[in-house]
């Protein structure tokens, strides 16, 4: 059809009309490699060699008035950009190469190409010569910063772009920022993007950024943790868990709220629903001050106490295994106490009740936990509870465990402050 023609026409023009000039220029910059073939990729590429660069100048002077000179010199810039040949790029710019020239196939500009090939020095050269540092490509709408944040290998370009003043919070039309790109590209196969995420956060990336689809910084962490249960080796699962923990630490350190609404985007809510599986991360969230209720609407929207008892009853109605049950109850008790100890007044949903009749096993233990919670809600708080809340608050930030162990207090008090029913008694004190 008519609409497809310009693209094909542009594609053919590369091959037919300005390709000879491009080939001649690149041929001058190549060095003969061992196979007798000229190679641009070889590390011995002597792009600083004066005679090569003089030869390039002579060709450009000779061809200045030839048809398609502008396209040829601009396309050559794309190619030397990919190879990181700074002196050659400088000459091409001097001879009129267009910084906004788009590759006829990918529609990337030289700056995009420099980032994709991780050439920070070329990135700097292009920006200093006036390349638009925040320009989005036509196909994917990615900025140079987006591309730099997607691969750990491009960290040098990411650092350079931020130093050169790239807008760290620029977003595409769907609201996706470079930080959301970095998080989204940290999929299970490739989870080493922590440094990029850290660099963006230190550069002022907004932790409250969200896409039009409602994806937030925690969407990707939740997705990865959910994936962990499937088809991974033990080692891969540990890698994912470590990565998610580290990223959550970074996000919280920069003010992210893991207890937001809707519940589907709340990391706290996600961990509460399966507290047995994500216990260390959940402990970290609570000890770092995350709300155990919806931070926007309070316990009427969702409540950590409600979710915890639901989880306990559901599992205890299905599994009879004694070690499994006792581990679950210990973690449940620890979780309930962590939530109780996070503030002086506890917040429960109104008319909060727990029906333990569904628990086929250990219903009485769950009932006891529930009664201690209701007791705390109804009566004036005991001094020891208030002291625990106060001391733990003073020992923040996370982790508070080692700080408690260092206090000049009797072991029994330390144990009460530590809140860890999964630890075997007092041996570690």
Task: Set out the residue ranges of the language-model regions.
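Ankyrin repeat boundary signal
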Residues: 68-69, 99-103, 133-137, 168-171, ...
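Ankyrin repeat domain, specifically the short helix-to-loop turn at the C-terminus of the second helix
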Residues: 58-64, 90-98, 124-132, 159-167, ...
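Solenoidal tandem-repeat scaffolds enriched in leucines and small polar residues
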Residues: 138, 150-211, 219
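N-terminal segments that cap or nucleate solenoid repeat domains
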Residues: 3-93, 97
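Start-of-repeat signature of ankyrin repeats
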Residues: 73, 106-107, 140-141, 175, ...
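Cullin-RING E3 adaptor/co-adaptor recruitment helices
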Residues: 3-24, 30-31, 271-284, 288-429
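Conserved ankyrin/ankyrin-like repeat signature
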Residues: 55, 87-88, 121-122, 153-157, ...
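Ankyrin repeat A-helix N-terminal signature
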Residues: 46-48, 79-85, 113-119, 147-154, ...
């Amino acid at each position: 059809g008519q609409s497809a023609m310009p693209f094909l026409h542009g594609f053919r023009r590369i091959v037919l009309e300005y390709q000879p000039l491009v080939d001649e220029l690149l041929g001058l910059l190549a060095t003969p490699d061992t196979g007798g073939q000229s190679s641009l990729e070889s590390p011995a590429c002597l792009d600083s060699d004066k005679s090569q660069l003089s030869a390039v100048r002579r060709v450009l002077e000779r061809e200045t008035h030839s048809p398609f000179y502008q396209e040829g010199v601009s396309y050559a810039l794309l190619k030397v950009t990919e190879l990181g040949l700074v002196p050659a790029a400088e000459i091409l710019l001097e001879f009129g190469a267009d910084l906004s020239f788009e590759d006829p196939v990918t529609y990337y500009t030289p700056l995009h190409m420099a980032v994709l090939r991780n050439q920070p020095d070329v990135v700097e050269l292009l920006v200093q010569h006036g390349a638009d540092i925040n320009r989005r490509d036509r196909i994917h709408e990615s900025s140079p910063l987006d591309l730099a944040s997607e691969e750990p290998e491009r960290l040098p370009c990411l650092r350079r772009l931020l130093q050169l003043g790239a807008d760290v919070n620029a977003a595409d039309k769907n609201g996706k920022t470079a930080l959301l790109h970095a998080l989204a590209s940290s999929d299970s196969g490739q989870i080493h993007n922590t440094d990029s995420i850290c660099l963006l956060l230190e550069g002022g990336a907004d932790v409250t950024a969200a896409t039009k689809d409602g994806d937030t910084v925690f969407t990707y962490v939740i997705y990865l943790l959910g994936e962990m249960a499937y088809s991974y080796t033990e080692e891969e699962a540990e890698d994912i868990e470590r990565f998610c923990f580290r990223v959550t630490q970074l996000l919280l350190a920069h003010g992210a709220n893991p207890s937001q609404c809707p519940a589907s985007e709340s990391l706290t809510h996600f961990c509460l629903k399966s507290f047995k599986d994500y216990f260390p991360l959940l402990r970290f969230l609570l000890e770092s001050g995350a709300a155990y209720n919806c931070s926007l609407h309070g316990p009427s929207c969702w409540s950590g106490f409600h979710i915890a008892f639901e989880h306990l009853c559901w599992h205890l109605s299905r599994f009879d295994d004694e070690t499994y049950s006792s581990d679950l109850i210990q973690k449940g008790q620890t979780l309930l106490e962590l939530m109780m100890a996070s503030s002086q007044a506890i917040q429960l949903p109104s008319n909060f009740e727990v029906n333990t009749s569904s628990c086929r096993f250990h219903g009485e233990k769950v009932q006891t936990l529930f009664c201690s919670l209701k007791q705390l809600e109804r009566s004036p708080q005991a001094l020891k509870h208030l002291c625990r809340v106060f001391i733990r608050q003073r020992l923040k930030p996370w982790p508070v465990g080692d700080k408690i162990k260092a206090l000049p207090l009797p072991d029994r008090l330390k144990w009460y402050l530590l809140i860890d029913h999964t630890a075997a008694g007092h041996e570690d004190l």
